[in-house]
């Protein structure tokens, strides 16, 4: 079977430019706190800038031991930040272990949706960070449209394939409380952010934002159906926009899956694990989020399940 890959909103592509202030308002409507938004050319630049801010707070930053993003590992080295690796339950933060290892006046960065596979206990993490005066940085790329936006700082990619699928860009949001704490350092952040060249894609981003809840819900529902039918699928009880399936010889399994389920842009529909960005366990991630949501009706999902079951 050949499936359409995730595409940007067609109306947004036809009306790509737009009003930045409108987009900032819609972003804040989707989140649980209000943020001052800085638009950037990529999600990675947003993560880097958030860690640059973290260094103002402390020389140490905590990251999850899996289910994050490669930049969480690389950028602290560039900024001379010490990495404090937090032990997780397959990417999901264990609150007791976080309580034991999180130092006062430090920083923590994680993704709202661990490895795109399962949600973090964001409310509880926020509470613990407030008690310890820890700067909480939340990467909302995989969960915007769902329950997210609890961090002191949020970062988001609007590249591909993401919930906000503009094939370009990203943004950083700083909460009003953190803006006040940063004081004069806020001017340095503004100067640094201006070194990043950005384009006007706010018409497209607006359409993606307006569809974010529907997009997130569709990927969660499709992934749930697949998880319920595949024997070795993990995180059945959790929301996720992709599916981890434990297996031996994941490279071979991945090759077989991609021979039966193809994307029309010829990209792989699987991620081979162990992989820090997903999960450090043998298996594959079936990347539901790479499929265009227009394809995800019950008939197509059933065909996917039949194809996966014939291999696994």
UniProtKB/Swiss-Prot annotation:
<dbReference type="InterPro" id="IPR015424">
    <property type="entry name" value="PyrdxlP-dep_Trfase"/>
</dbReference>
<dbReference type="GO" id="GO:0008483">
    <property type="term" value="F:transaminase activity"/>
</dbReference>
<dbReference type="GO" id="GO:0000271">
    <property type="term" value="P:polysaccharide biosynthetic process"/>
</dbReference>
<dbReference type="GO" id="GO:0030170">
    <property type="term" value="F:pyridoxal phosphate binding"/>
</dbReference>
<dbReference type="InterPro" id="IPR000653">
    <property type="entry name" value="DegT/StrS_aminotransferase"/>
</dbReference>
<protein>
    <recommendedName>
        <fullName>Uncharacterized protein MJ1341</fullName>
    </recommendedName>
</protein>
<dbReference type="InterPro" id="IPR015421">
    <property type="entry name" value="PyrdxlP-dep_Trfase_major"/>
</dbReference>
